[in-house]
Amino acid sequence: MAKEKFERNKPHVNVGTIGHVDHGKTTLTAALTRVCSEVFGSARVDFDKIDSAPEEKARGITINTAHVEYDSNIRHYAHVDCPGHADYVKNMITGAAQMDGAILVCSAADGPMPQTREHILLSRQVGVPYIVVFLNKADMVDDAELLELVEMEVRDLLSTYDFPGDDTPIIIGSALMALNGQDDNEMGTTAVKRLVETLDTYIPEPERAIDKPFLMPIEDVFSISGRGTVVTGRVERGIVRIQEEVEIVGLRDTQKTTCTGVEMFRKLLDEGRAGENCGVLLRGTKRDDVERGQVLVKPGTVKPHTKFTAEVYVLSKEEGGRHTPFFKGYRPQFYFRTTDVTGNCELPEGVEMVMPGDNIQMTVTLIKTIAMEDGLRFAIREGGRTVGAGVVAKVIE
């Protein structure tokens, strides 16, 4: 059978289910594919297939993730669902599957539980911009007041972590009913349809990488006699055009220069775009003025920083990480984009040590500046071996 052509005519949005174990994330994921296949004609995926999620490697970390796709009237959704709590932690911190919005699944019968809270906190830390709530198993709750109470609890919890709790859409229903094609009191199929319509309206269309301000991590520097200095790398976002000013940020004082040429596969171009590997010729910049690990950016868009708070996952021994815990004052290398910089770790109040396999918030102070923004991913390494993964939660200075 020939592969179907990937339709580019609908905007593409990445979502995922989050929430406490056994509250119905995977059932809802399967129900979404079923309802969308009937209403909008996308493919249906069964529960068992999603539940036995394949292993993936992201930054050397093993993560089990199931990817499904479904369509609404106006969009194409790529949806991630993880079987275990540890998989969520790793997934969100490494950014293996970055979400434009999350569906928080909470059982109406149980209310918010520890992982409900933890997933909301993680979403805040790693920069998931929007959360929509599906209050599941509502067919098991006869008391309308109880439903209202759970809804209030969820709203309070969202507000605690700086999400707009009062304005967050909450859909009440039963994923299992929808999966089985039932719809008593509009709690099954109708509720899931309502959820998809909510995703369409509440989660804005993500800005495409090409529309964001230009940024290219520098991987290599060459000097070409008679032409000047060329830096190479893969354009992360935006577009660089000839004769535009750019800044070189990180590791040293920020320098301004001008792009005088863009080359790709030995061909001269007028511009380099997001996703392309290219060489950028810099006017008046000497070979020794630039090094791997710096970034080329649109002037004024990204600043160099040394201190930030981060959410970090520490690899377990089985994943090839450390065999022993670390303590405050730990000084590993932080690998940002293309280079390592040594940094000092401050642990939260009352935390004495961090065990392999833990996730932890920490404050890091680097010995050199790095071009960084909230949401930037990094690896933690010791002598070239990855021992952790993290994301910048908030830049401090």
UniProtKB/Swiss-Prot annotation:
Binding site for Mg(2+): 26
GO molecular-function term, one example from the UniProt record: translation elongation factor activity
Residues where GTP binds: 19-26, 81-85, 136-139
UniProt catalytic activity: GTP + H2O = GDP + phosphate + H(+)
Classification via Pfam families: GTP_EFTU (PF00009), GTP_EFTU_D2 (PF03144), GTP_EFTU_D3 (PF03143)
Stretches for region G2: 60-64
Region of interest (G4), ranges: 136-139
SUPFAM superfamilies assigned: EF-Tu/eEF-1alpha/eIF2-gamma C-terminal domain, P-loop containing nucleoside triphosphate hydrolases, Translation proteins
Keywords: Cytoplasm, Elongation factor, GTP-binding, Hydrolase, Magnesium, Metal-binding, Nucleotide-binding, Protein biosynthesis
EC number: 3.6.5.3
Subcellular compartments: Cytoplasm
Sequence segments annotated as region (G3): 81-84
Transmembrane segments: none
Region (G5): 174-176
Domain tr-type G: 10-207
Enzyme class, UniProt record, top EC level: hydrolase
Role this protein plays: GTP hydrolase that promotes the GTP-dependent binding of aminoacyl-tRNA to the A-site of ribosomes during protein biosynthesis.
Assembly, per entry: Monomer.
Protein name, per record: Elongation factor Tu
Gene: tuf1
